[in-house]
């Protein structure tokens, strides 16, 4: 394996792009390998090395790197008819109607250009709709590069988590631990009349895939209803990945007031969306008074790719395939970790998976255990080992993942996300043979 071309490209990139990348998560150590093209479930780098890909663009690529023919045909058709028009298009209406038919919370939807733009708009909408300022977020949750949610601390001592954000912004945000019923209850007892919304991922999908414990999402639904606050689910990652076309909210049986989307809803193209109850969403301009607009919003090529991607999933065995392989992969990694690396906790569901390296070994591997990744099941003998909060993942052996495990898997030509926090994904292009090969690599690397 040689990296000569990637190294040369990295040196060039360093002179014109900060850190040599356009997204910090791509800055793998000691330097990134530069991808030239994708092929099915694989990517090929600038040096011609082929990797089995589980990054999948960090989530948007439900089908891998070869789109189904109807999706490709739609993309080509809309591209040939002109890049954009500055006016509404029929495909926007079709895509919006499809999403509204399948996602429980969505009666109306506004398409935007990224997941970050979706969550920024959702926070503004919640404040405009309720007339309140405070937003509750989960520690370890991620809602894009926006000032309202890049915070750290606790409700009494909140600070921005990055330079460049005034402290005055952070005072309107209340961070609490995910899965902590007492903490969220206390926040509402103290600030309930000022809380515009609770903004949370139904699963902490950007921080080790932390699933909700039984009753937690239901408790959020109850508290927000009681205090006339909004419940916003950030399904940028889980949308149309977990729970199929109904998204994670349908899998867990909890319907939020507003949902944000990104990634899969655009079929692999830049996209975001805010959907929810009609009486809330119509507060966006021009029907309401909460300003929201964008030059590229509802871009026809993106709308066509997203609509045809979801339509194909509705008509074929896409979710059965990816979820079966995801369960098989998590189960296989669980068996390997039990034998070779007791400190490794396998997390994920449906077609998502990750391995978290805890600093202490498992309390037990005997008796009733989750066979294909942590399910937050109290009867499981490893329940106490399973991450419950973002802090549980942040305190794990992140350096083992980045400096040892990721490099070992790359040596086996397996492309995983480069830190312990980001999820990995099985696509429709993956096969049972790919899973076999991946498990052999895990066996060696663990």
Curated annotation (Swiss-Prot):
Its cofactor is pyridoxal 5'-phosphate. The modification N6-(pyridoxal phosphate)lysine is found at residue 263. It catalyses: (S)-4-amino-5-oxopentanoate = 5-aminolevulinate. It comes from Haloquadratum walsbyi (strain DSM 16790 / HBSQ001). This is Glutamate-1-semialdehyde 2,1-aminomutase. Pathway: Porphyrin-containing compound metabolism; protoporphyrin-IX biosynthesis; 5-aminolevulinate from L-glutamyl-tRNA(Glu): step 2/2. SUPFAM superfamilies: PLP-dependent transferases. One of its GO terms (cellular component) is cytoplasm. NCBIfam families: PRK00062.1. Keywords: Cytoplasm, Isomerase, Porphyrin biosynthesis, Pyridoxal phosphate. It is found in: Cytoplasm. The keyword Cytoplasm applies. Belongs to the class-III pyridoxal-phosphate-dependent aminotransferase family. HemL subfamily. One of its GO terms (biological process) is protoporphyrinogen IX biosynthetic process. It comes from the Archaea. The gene is hemL. PROSITE patterns: AA_TRANSFER_CLASS_3 (PS00600). InterPro entries: 4pyrrol_synth_GluAld_NH2Trfase (IPR004639), Aminotrans_3 (IPR005814), Aminotrans_3_PPA_site (IPR049704), PyrdxlP-dep_Trfase (IPR015424), PyrdxlP-dep_Trfase_major (IPR015421), PyrdxlP-dep_Trfase_small (IPR015422). Its EC number is 5.4.3.8. GO terms for molecular function: glutamate-1-semialdehyde 2,1-aminomutase activity; pyridoxal phosphate binding; transaminase activity.
